[in-house]
Amino acid sequence: MEKSPFPTEDMALTTILVVSEMSRAKDFYQDVLGAEIYREYGGDSCVIRFLGNWILLVTAGGPTDDKPDTQFVPPLNPENVSHSFTIRVKDCMGCYETLKERGADFLTPPVDWGAEIRAFFRDPDGHLFEISQA
């Protein structure tokens, strides 16, 4: 087998998020974040495009031949975070107001840390997002 260069500019990184209820997740990503649904696969997965990035929403599932001994599960406890998404914005307070009006569930209003103003919110399954103005 021949080697291929890696990475190359024509590659793309896709984040997989496991969700408990696909319709609720799609509503959140479309209606709250303004993401575009790119493609759906039989009701248990959905590709969305957000800020030039790909996010694959999938429902829970067990091991497969290409990922043995691996379970896909939504966050069990949203208070324990292993990853989060940061959205860099020019106006944190303005984006906070817009997202809050659309239904985003913020942990607190924006906090000014001097060099950065930021606020955190979760999707319906507890995946953590941050809006950050630096």
Q: Model-derived features: where do they sit?
A:
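Conserved active-site tyrosine of GNAT-family acetyltransferases
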Residues: 25-30, 99, 126
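Short glycine-/small-residue motifs
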Residues: 128-131
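Vicinal oxygen chelate
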Residues: 1-14, 36-87, 94-122, 133-134
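Conserved beta-strand-loop-alpha-helix junction that forms the acyl-donor binding cleft
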Residues: 19-22
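Charged catalytic carboxylate motif
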Residues: 24, 91
